[in-house]
């Protein structure tokens, strides 16, 4: 099965609590084992439990692709070491890189796959270049449908992308060129336009908030390359 509906302690906003790539899922601590097992089965990569600055909202605070995961620069040393040790145990060669900036919610401000990255226009050009260098991809600054929180306004994998329903045709073409995949508009969790906050997805599957409707699931499957 490549798509499943889940809740995290009754919250349908799965993307807030994790970071998914084609090599690993970094997930908040404290979830039931049966839910971790669903994530492993659907996304088909190791699942590593973690916290960032003792917070569970690691999908808000961090972002990444197969090359690197970017976290706030003041992440605790013990947390960073725990993540790196887990990656070593699983043989995961993804770097974990603290990034110095005045912004904390990096996951809300960075949208990336293994082919490109869109960073919020809030970042300076110099910061954007550094982010692109860390992630090892082409990077552009911008917004989606006028929204600076591009990481919450979209989800993108190496197979496809889904973004805020008010994105224009021109934006979809631009995003498709940047990420080298087809990008569509859609919603999740019964009409929520901030799809990046609603799901965890990679090239192998997607877990989405339990409030997501049947028509929304069909659109998500199409956009992320499973149909």
UniProtKB/Swiss-Prot annotation:
A Pfam family the protein falls into: eIF-6
SMART domains hit by this protein: eIF6
Domain of life: Archaea
One Gene Ontology term from the biological process aspect of the record: cytosolic ribosome assembly
Keyword Cell inner membrane included in the entry's annotation: no
InterPro entries in UniProt: eIF6
Keywords: Initiation factor, Protein biosynthesis
Example of a GO MF term: ribosome binding
Listed PANTHER family: TRANSLATION INITIATION FACTOR 6
Family the UniProt entry places it in: Belongs to the eIF-6 family.
Function description: Binds to the 50S ribosomal subunit and prevents its association with the 30S ribosomal subunit to form the 70S initiation complex.
Protein name: Translation initiation factor 6
Organism: Pyrococcus furiosus (strain ATCC 43587 / DSM 3638 / JCM 8422 / Vc1)
Gene name of the record: eif6
